[in-house]
């Protein structure tokens, strides 16, 4: 993706360098050419790791892999079925994103040639995984980021094992960081705290230049925490790590609720609770709550700005 965009940029530079000859090109034709070569940000949401186990419904749509087969022109979160549908619909409505879901029973791969291989996407969203990644999958995820991909991780609280297989999201994510076969020393510079924090309204740091806090979808002032956890930063392992939203009374390397980092040529974001992304809609039988629009936080802006940043938009 980066290569193709760079190619377009070089072509544009060559056009400008032709001087007066460039004036002979009709402006409408140039605009039409630019429109046809615009490339959408490709985002893959994971559903291969028990994201709908128990009372969870962390999908953008039940139509998988392509949510547009449920509704090609969604207007609200109810256009698609899933507790993350508001997130997906907001991206879809911009016309700048191409969304897919990795269905249950699938394997996460990188460089396999499969249609849903990570190499075909700019950003991979893993919302509260409940099944441990295999050794090959952990390697694939790390290499994806290392080579320019964006990874969005959402954890939940300690003992949030929804499918009773002995693994919850904090343990699964920490295992990814320390047992991936590529870099086993916290490659992204943070770890998930093994905690169950009942409630808080974490606040954003004061950083006018941060692209996630001040992005294309609005300004982030804070988030909500409703049975979740936090992260410990380890800048000695990766100096690019940064906490941008913190639990009340916390700062520095402890108590970070939303974290960003870089690794290789890729980017990473992590959120300490699934509640802020929950839009309160989804499949029947799930007890869901609308954290997406909770006035105690600016959760929609946080999720969407982070997605844009990870996709290098």
Predicted segments with their positions:
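Bacterial N-terminal signal peptides that target proteins for export
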Residues: 1-11
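C-terminal region of N-terminal signal peptides and the immediate post-cleavage residues
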Residues: 17-36
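Short, surface-exposed patches at the edges or C-terminal ends of soluble domains, predominantly
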Residues: 34-313
């Amino acid at each position: 993706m980066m290569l193709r965009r760079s190619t377009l940029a070089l072509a544009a530079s060559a056009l400008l360098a032709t001087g007066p000859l460039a004036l002979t090109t009709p402006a409408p034709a140039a605009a039409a050419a630019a429109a046809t070569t615009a490339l959408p940000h490709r985002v893959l949401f994971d559903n291969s790791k028990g994201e709908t186990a128990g009372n969870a419904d962390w999908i953008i749509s039940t139509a998988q892999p392509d949510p547009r087969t449920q509704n090609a022109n969604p207007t609200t979160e109810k256009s698609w079925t899933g507790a993350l549908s508001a997130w997906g619909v907001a991206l879809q409505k911009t016309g700048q994103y191409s969304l897919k879901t990795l269905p249950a029973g699938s394997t996460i791969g990188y460089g396999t040639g499969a249609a849903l291989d990570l190499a075909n996407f700019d950003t991979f969203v893993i919302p509260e995984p409940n099944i441990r990644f295999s050794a090959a999958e952990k390697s694939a995820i790390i290499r994806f980021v290392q080579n320019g991909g964006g990874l969005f991780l959402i954890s939940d609280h300690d003992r949030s094992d929804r499918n009773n297989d002995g693994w919850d999201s904090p343990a699964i994510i920490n295992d990814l960081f320390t047992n991936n076969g590529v870099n086993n020393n916290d490659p992204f510079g943070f770890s998930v705290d093994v905690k169950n924090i009942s409630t808080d309204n974490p606040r954003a740091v004061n950083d006018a230049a941060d692209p996630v806090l001040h992005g294309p979808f609005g300004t982030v002032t804070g988030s909500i925490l409703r049975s979740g956890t936090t992260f410990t930063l380890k800048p000695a392992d990766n100096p690019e790590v940064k906490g941008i939203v913190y639990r009340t009374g916390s700062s520095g390397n402890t108590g970070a609720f939303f974290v960003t980092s870089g690794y290789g040529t890729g980017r990473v974001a992590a959120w300490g609770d699934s509640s802020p992304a929950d839009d309160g809609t989804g499949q029947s039988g799930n007890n869901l709550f609308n954290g997406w629009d909770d006035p105690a936080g600016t959760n929609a802006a946080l999720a969407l700005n982070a997605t844009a940043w990870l996709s290098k938009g």
